[in-house]
Regions:
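Short, polar/flexible loop-turn hinges at active-site or ligand-entry regions and domain interfaces
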Residues: 27-29, 55-57, 74-80, 99-107, ...
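Interdomain boundary/hinge elements
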Residues: 78-81, 105, 260-266, 355
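Accessory beta->alpha helical hairpin/"wing" motif in late/C-terminal subdomains of nucleic-acid enzymes
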Residues: 259-285, 446-454
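Alpha-helical scaffold elements adjacent to nucleotide-binding pockets in ATP/GTP-utilizing enzyme cores
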Residues: 40, 44, 63-71, 91-95, ...
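Intrinsically disordered, low-complexity regulatory segments
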Residues: 1-114, 120, 181, 409
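Long, highly charged, low-complexity internal segments
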Residues: 2-30, 137-251, 283-298, 302-304, ...
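C-terminal or mid-to-C-terminal helical accessory/interaction module adjacent to the motor/catalytic core
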Residues: 33, 39-40, 66, 87-170, ...
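Short, conserved phosphate-binding/catalytic loop or strand-edge motifs used
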Residues: 85-90, 224-225, 245-254, 258-267, ...
Length: 454
């Protein structure tokens, strides 16, 4: 059907296609250009004994199946609904074993959202167009736009405040002034910083050295929103571009003599992985990196607004490495697939381990602090270091110093000013929308694109 075949009409009161006075009953009409699609499908149905509806495995897909059921005149006894989350031979064949009927609750959910979109969006858009140069408004779009406007007003109202930092420079590391008599110190101007500098000498006493071994856990597999956020931050891809490329990776790439779906369905709130994928990945990790690198699957914390009907976004086969499919992908397809692949792989690998050292130095009751981190077991970072900050900062073994006195090479100070809140990047706006429960994963890209273009 190539997507939706019907939508709300623009007839009736306010052109909503919704009978507000009759229990909000919707009136549907065929989408322009879809009459031929429907006619062709009707011919195919007449030649068939049984019909399988295999639209996308989400709310919109369920609604499309329902509309097709209606316009094609299907009967309960001559159709089934099948669902798969990856376009692979095994997944498609397995879906026939779990065939079901249309989930009317999902359909009703989609219909309610669409009606709300129309009631709010249509009427608000017309009001805005009559009063301003605005192009459109919407149930999700307008709230997201308010976030952007509120942030801009914060920036405009922001008044910078002066502050100063003081740093002691030693042969192998630097330490920053943190406290005075172990209470947080704030230096507001040049007069105050000069008073501090006058009291400091070059000799520092090692007051305390703390050493801890910490575990650094890998992140869960991608959801729609986390994929869009990291693609924006690391690959400089817009949400729209990310979803376009992900759609292609999901639908299939030509690999030699076959078309293969490389990733699972990319509109999802879930971080779950199938038992089969976990088992295969554990075997892959053991064979390639060793048993010490095997981790455990992430468990989601249940949120009220999360729909956990699917898996997280992952490669359809852990054996199909990014390097093995590189010749068949464009540069952007390769970059996105590589990020999805290694995120899923890393999520099932062992924690990284770091030795963390912090030192407190005293100079005339002023305490300076420095910290260092060394990776002692790379764990999941063996495959995921390109996407996380893994910079090491090494401190000398200060706890073994015979003398408790260190002499600095120099002590410097620097003027700073507080910064206004940053404007939203696409990644930060998506994160904020998700945390506030604004919109759905499937709407983020379109919402942001509308705001950007209109």
């Amino acid at each position: 059907s190539k997507g939706h075949v019907r939508d709300l009409s623009t007839s009736g009161k306010f052109g909503l296609g919704v009978d507000i006075e009759n229990h909000f009953k919707p009136k549907y009409t065929t989408i322009k250009g879809k009459k031929k699609v429907i006619d062709d499908l009707k011919k195919d149905v007449k030649k068939s004994d049984f019909v399988y509806l295999a639209t996308d495995p989400d709310r919109e897909g369920e609604a499309i199946s329902w509309h097709l059921y209606d316009v094609l005149g299907l009967k309960p006894e001559n159709y089934d609904r099948i669902v798969f989350h990856e376009i692979t031979k095994n997944a498609v064949l397995d879906s026939f074993k779990h065939a079901r009927k249309i989930d009317q609750d999902l359909v009703n959910s989609q219909e309610a959202r669409r009606i709300l979109d129309r009631i709010i969006g249509f009427r608000l858009s017309k009001l805005i167009q009559s009063k301003t140069d605005g192009k459109s408004a919407g149930r999700v779009q307008s709230v997201a736009l308010k976030l952007i406007v509120d942030r801009e007003r914060e920036i405009e109202a922001f008044i910078p405040e002066e502050y100063w930092s003081v740093t002691a420079h030693f042969k192998e590391f630097d330490a920053d002034l943190a406290t005075y008599n172990h209470k947080k110190i704030e230096i507001h101007n040049e007069v105050e910083v000069n008073e501090v500098m006058e009291k400091l000498g070059n000799a520092f006493t090692i007051e305390k050295v703390d050493k801890k071994t910490k575990n650094k856990k890998s992140k869960a597999p991608f959801t729609t929103s986390t994929l869009q956020q990291l693609a924006s931050n690391k690959l400089n891809m817009s949400a729209k571009k990310t979803m376009t490329i992900a759609q292609k990776l999901y639908e299939g790439i030509e690999l030699e003599d076959e078309t293969v779906g490389l990733i699972t369905y990319m509109r999802t709130d879930s971080i779950r992985l199938s038992d089969e994928f976990i088992k295969n990945t554990y075997g892959f990790i053991k064979a390639k990196y060793g048993e010490d690198y095997i981790g455990y699957a992430k468990q989601a914390k249940k949120k009220d607004n999360v729909q956990d009907a699917h898996e997280g976004i992952r490669p359809t086969s852990i054996n199909r490495t990014p390097e093995s499919v590189r010749p068949y992908l464009s540069d952007d397809e390769f970059k996105l697939y590589r990020m999805i692949y290694y995120r899923a792989l890393a999520s099932l690998m062992a924690d990284a381990k770091t030795d963390n050292t912090s030192v407190t130095l005293d100079n005339n009751n002023y305490q300076f602090k420095a910290s260092g981190q060394v990776i002692i077991f790379d764990g999941y970072l063996k495959v995921y270091s390109d996407y996380e900050d893994t910079k090491e900062s090494i401190l000398p073994p200060l706890d073994t110093y015979q003398s408790k006195i260190l002499v600095s090479n120099s002590i410097t100070n620097e003027q700073h000013f507080t910064s206004p809140p940053a404007r939203y990047t696409e990644a930060k706006l998506i994160k904020e929308m998700e945390e506030l429960g604004i919109g759905r994963p499937s709407t983020y890209a379109k919402t942001i694109d509308n705001i950007r273009t209109r």
